[in-house]
Amino acid sequence: MYQHILLAVPLQRWEEYSPHALAARDAAVAIAKGSGAQLSVLSVYDYDNVSDPGLSAEMAARYREDLMLRTDSEMETKMKAFLAGIQGHDLPITPLLKTGEPRKMILTMIELLHPDLLVIGSHSKRSVLDVILGGTAAYLLRHAPCSVIMVQPKGEKSPPSTTE
């Protein structure tokens, strides 16, 4: 069946994990357990821009460096906590944290890792951010060179199609 599953989840934007990320995680774990596949868990994030005209170039550079270190540390903590929810399943799991634009980085990681399945969560269209991320999910469904499963949390209705 499947040998390598890539689970892509947006951990940066949530204090607590979204129902979409948790549903995708549960589905990826179930499929990996059923097929004996390796599971890679990818979260792509970015750094907030520093754009304060009152800061000197040196201060802005120091602030940005500090922001990057804090963001990296925060993302490592979020990934560990997210993976703690699947400990004890006796699965080979590889956590991956990358910076960049999600759709591009996910496709890059697919090219590097060669998974035979990508698992992503669907996103409801409640905010501009959800529309953007929903666009990422739709893009991956069209462009990923492997099978893709898009998972919705239980009880959530499918959003209207945006590709018609």
Task: List where the protein language model places each region.
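Small/aliphatic-rich secondary-structure junction motif
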Residues: 1-61
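Short, flexible loop segments at boundaries between secondary-structure elements
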Residues: 146-158
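Glycine-rich, Arg-bearing micro-motifs that act as flexible, cationic patches
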Residues: 117-139, 157-158
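Short secondary-structure boundary segments
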Residues: 9, 43, 121-123, 152-153
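General small-molecule cofactor/ligand-binding pocket signal
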Residues: 40-42, 94-98, 149
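Structural beta-alpha unit
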Residues: 1, 84-118, 155-164
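Acidic, proline/glycine-rich short linear motifs
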Residues: 42-74, 157-164
